[in-house]
Regions:
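S-adenosylmethionine/decaboxylated-SAM
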Residues: 4, 8, 36-61, 72, ...
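General helical structural elements
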Residues: 20-23, 68, 94
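N-terminal auxiliary segments of SAM/dcSAM-dependent transferases
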Residues: 1-31
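N-terminal pre-P-loop "Q-motif" helix
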Residues: 62-67
C-alpha cells in the first residue's frame, strides 16, 4: 500500500533538537486536523487488527491510530528492534501491535509486560489509581486469544517490571518501539529507565497516559526525567507523548 501520510508543504524533514518535526506534524496534525483519521479507518490492515483486538482494549482511537502509523510507516526507517509494552492490562493493544507487526516485520516480537493481577500499592500524594485497579485482566483468556490468532510473535510476560525486565531485555536485545502504558509514577519511571539502554538509534518512546487527567504521576516522570534530566524534546504531544531515543 502506498503512503497516505499528509505532505507538509514548505517544511523540511530531518532531525532538529532530538525530534523529526516534519514526521511529528504528519502524524499529530494529520490525525487531528488533516484528514488522516479517515484514511486510517479505511486501511484494511488497521481494520483487521482492530477487529481482533477491540473487545480487549480500552486505548483511545487516536492513540491506537498513532501507534498504527508508527508501525505502518516509520519503523522501517530505523534499525530493526522488537516492540515492548509496559502495562498491557487485557492485552488488546498488544494483540493489535502484534497482528500488525506479524504482517509487516517478519521476526519482530512484541513483549507484553504486566502483573495481570492489578496495580500494586500506590502513593496517593502522586497517583490517583489504587492498589488492585485493572485487576480483571484474565491472563488465561488472553493467552487463549493469542493462541487462537496464532500470534507467535506476541510474548506475554507476567510479573512486576522490576522482576521481569532484565530477562526480557536479554531475549530482545534491541527495542524499536516502547509503549509505556502503566499509569503510575514508579512504574513509568522504571519502564523508561529499564528500556532506554536497549533502544535502537531513533527508536520511539510512546507514553500512552502521561497526558491523561488521572495520571499526573506519569506526567511528572516525563517532565522530571525525559525533559529536565535527559533534555529530550517530544516529537508529538497529541494524541500522546512521543519521544525519540537518538544515540
Amino acid at each position: 500500500m502506498e503512503s497516505y501520510l499528509p505532505i507538509m508543504n514548505g517544511m523540511t524533514t530531518g532531525i532538529r533538537q532530538g525530534r523529526n518535526v516534519y514526521e511529528g506534524y504528519q502524524r499529530g496534525w494529520g490525525l487531528q486536523f488533516g484528514g488522516l483519521r479517515e484514511k486510517v479507518l479505511a486501511d484494511p490492515l488497521y481494520r483487521e487488527a482492530f477487529a481482533v483486538a477491540r473487545d480487549r482494549t480500552i486505548m483511545s482511537e487516536e492513540n491506537r491510530m498513532n501507534i498504527y502509523l508508527l508501525l505502518r510507516f516509520y519503523l522501517d526507517k530505523i534499525p530493526f528492534g522488537h516492540i515492548i509494552e509496559y502495562g498491557s492490562y487485557r492485552g488488546g493493544s498488544a494483540i493489535f501491535m502484534a497482528y500488525v507487526a506479524q504482517k509487516l516485520y517478519p521476526g519482530m516480537k512484541v513483549f507484553a509486560l504486566d502483573s495481570f493481577e492489578g496495580m500494586p500499592q500506590t502513593d496517593k500524594n502522586v497517583d490517583a489509581h489504587n492498589a488492585g485497579d485493572f485487576g480483571d485482566a484474565d491472563l488465561e483468556k488472553l493467552q487463549a486469544r493469542v493462541d487462537k490468532l496464532k500470534l507467535d510473535n506476541l510474548v506475554l510476560v507476567k510479573g512486576f517490571f522490576e522482576d521481569t525486565n532484565d530477562d526480557v531485555m536479554a531475549q530482545a536485545g534491541k527495542i524499536s518501539l516502547a509503549h509505556i502504558d502503566c499509569d503510575i509514577a514508579p512504574a513509568v519511571k522504571y519502564s523508561y529507565e529499564g528500556v532506554l539502554p536497549y533502544m535502537v538509534d531513533g527508536g520511539y518512546l510512546v507514553f500512552d497516559d502521561a497526558t491523561v487527567s488521572s495520571c499526573i504521576g506519569a506526567t511528572e516522570v516525563v517532565e522530571d526525567l525525559l525533559i529536565r534530566r535527559d533534555g529530550l524534546n517530544s516529537e508529538q504531544i497529541w494524541p500522546h507523548f512521543v519521544f525519540r531515543a537518538f544515540k
